[in-house]
Amino acid sequence: MKNQKSCQQEALIFPEKRRVPSQIPTFNQPENAPMIHLKPEDLSIPDLQRTLQFAVGPRPIALASTIDRDGRVNLSPFSFFNVFSTNPPILIFSPANRGRDGSTKDTLHNVLAVPEVVIHSVSHAMVEQTSLSSTEYPTGVNEFLKAGFTPVESTLVHPPRVAEAPVAMECEVLEVKALGDG
């Protein structure tokens, strides 16, 4: 009986007025837990994003380095990232708008101006520094310096590589496609 009550409580984790990440369902629910039905139009954008991020996980993290027209470096992590094709090799990532104010991120501005990016895999040893690079600094602030990463000259593209990264993929941007409002 205790499990049934717990199951019912789990089913009510999305109250009407307030939703927080701790209220997103987990994969640890009992087998007989009722399915939670959500309509995207009923959720705020932040709640929808958290729900999608929970549902598609764990996700790899891409650490993307770009430069602007003036050669200023930007370094930013992205959890909406994956490999889409092998032949030709194609990576995708989504520099969604900032949650704070809906503005576009420097990474997007940079790849539109200089269509090159270095995508790095993030190791466990890099987690804290990667988190520091995710801070929303003003345009022009060098996240390599703020996070304590070592920039290394790339071989094929202009943005630098992260010396500490186990993998760095130097990429030319083939396409930037706007999807939705954020």
Please identify what each model-predicted range represents.
Residues 13-19, 24-76, 82-182:
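Active-site-proximal mixed secondary-structure blocks
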